[in-house]
Amino acid sequence: SKRYSLCGARVGFIVSKNSEFIQTCLKFALTRLSPPTLALIAANHALNSGEDYIENVIKEYYKRREVVINELSQIDNIKFSNPMGAFYSMIKLPIENAEDFAKFLLTDFSYKNQTVMLSPASGFYSSENYGKDEVRIAFVLNSEKLKNAIKIIKLGLKEFIG
């Protein structure tokens, strides 16, 4: 599903010569009933769109990644990864608690009546000691919206730190 920007659609396929494995997968599929109808329609369209569609999606995500990396580079005292395959980046912020910052953005901060919802990174690690000062930014918005979102993060961070 991610290959076609259908994250969350929960569609995909399995190919195997192992009949026992296929039977086990079928049991799981039957207990789940089926993916939502709209997800199936979208997946069918994506699968039949050809390689041009995939190439355009890849180009768009590369563009979004470059926008995010360039905009983040203009924020002092943060560290971030330049992902090679993921459509998100983890950002280490100069704060102790990213969850508090995320809440602050939602409840106490806005720029031109806009704010940003961030994912604190601690939920993406198996150890509770990791990611407390990190957030995850996904490249799901178009380039202009990503630029604006990072500007809001920059201004919000400045106000949050004081």
Task: Indicate where each model-derived feature is located.
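PLP-dependent class I/II
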Residues: 1-162
